[in-house]
Amino acid sequence: MTFIEQSRMITNRWVAAILVGMVITIESSYAIKPNRVYSYTPDKLKLTYEEITVNTDDGTSLNVWHLPSEEEGRPIIISQSDAGNMGDWLYLGLYLQAYGLDVWMYDYRGFGHSNDFAIVQDQLFHTEFVTDLDAVAEYVYQKTGKAPALMGLSMGTIIVNEFLRRTNIPIGKVIFDGYVANPKEWIRRLAANGKTVTFPDGYRNRKYRQKEVESLFIVSEKDTYSIISDIPRGKQGKHIKTFDCEHISGFFRFPEEYTTGIVSFIEESF
């Protein structure tokens, strides 16, 4: 049995339980709600992996799971949403690994088994999370010698965009699911639904202007926060894939189509 066949067999065993758990997590988003306890771990799913500690420039230790590909696959770094921890997205990592990508997952400070951090729940994000991605991306680039692809989920799209503004690390491609094009507009939409969210102290809101990085935007058609009209117009190298589902739930509703769409996008033209 090949590596991919083994991985697919494992995913089929766990799919029902993970779908139920993740739908609950997704519904509780729109506030920073980290969880220190992993519901799913690579050991529990019997995955090939290594657990790594990556240190940031400001002295924080981050927990990282590396799910290596069977061959020299393209590295992808997943920046998660604002709730739970990377264990909630391990099923996604498993699928991407099974399809040949070199997967890197990490917890922001205050999430999972990364260092403690004073979380302000009703804040859109913490700028320190961008520092976390700085450290992980630098580690992955130095370790693999390849320009990593980046994937951001909901709040993670903010982290990726803020990172792109300041990094000198070469980036392969970018995948956004639950895209936050304009943080100020995102806060307005949340307020219209009774949720008060603030910016980090000293944060200067600017509508994102994409660097020349080829990007895939995954859009959930029933999402009332991240909508297709938010996607930058006229951007070269822009790809859009839609799913009939709610906010950042495309993978859990359509795992095969979601995964193959990402893998095809990353591997195309490399």
Spans of model-derived segments:
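Active-site glycine-rich loops that stabilize anionic/oxyanionic intermediates
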Residues: 73, 79-84
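Conserved alpha/beta-hydrolase "acid-adjacent" motif
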Residues: 224-230
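Hydrolase active-site cap/lid region
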Residues: 158-209
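Conserved alpha/beta-hydrolase
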Residues: 97-116
